[in-house]
């Protein structure tokens, strides 16, 4: 829990070493946070960028994620062409997205897939400023 000037928020993260096989679901994580901290605004650090609908249904305020490396290959005015698992034209490839009261910020990141070179997709580090 972070606190500043009497305002509190939860900063939580998803443990995701082997993907969905061994990580908590967004619902499980949201239930644990609510039980421990009540209904505080929550910033979720989540590796996977393709679950915005689930994050929003759980009531997370802000989700910071990556995973798709910006779509690996990018074209101007089109965006990412190839996503995780070979998904063609991933929707949440880079940028800011809204669903209900949830804001998801997706970074293109610094790394690359082991078997693919990044084309038209410069590495990216984001600075996110929170304002009340």
Feature map (PLM): residue ranges:
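Soluble catalytic domains of enzymes that build or remodel membrane lipids, polysaccharides, and related
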Residues: 1-132
């Amino acid at each position: 829990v972070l606190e500043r000037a009497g305002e509190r928020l939860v900063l939580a993260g998803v443990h995701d070493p082997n993907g969905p096989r061994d990580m908590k679901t967004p619902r499980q994580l949201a239930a644990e946070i609510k039980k421990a901290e009540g209904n505080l605004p929550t910033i979720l650090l989540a590796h996977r960028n393709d679950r915005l609908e689930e994050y929003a249904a759980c009531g997370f305020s802000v989700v910071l994620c990556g995973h798709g490396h910006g779509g690996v290959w990018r074209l101007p005015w089109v965006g990412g062409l190839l996503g995780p698992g070979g998904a063609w034209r991933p929707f949440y490839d880079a940028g800011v997205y809204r669903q209900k009261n949830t804001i998801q910020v997706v970074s293109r990141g610094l790394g690359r897939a082991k078997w693919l070179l990044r084309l038209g997709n410069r590495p990216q580090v984001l600075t996110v400023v929170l304002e009340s």
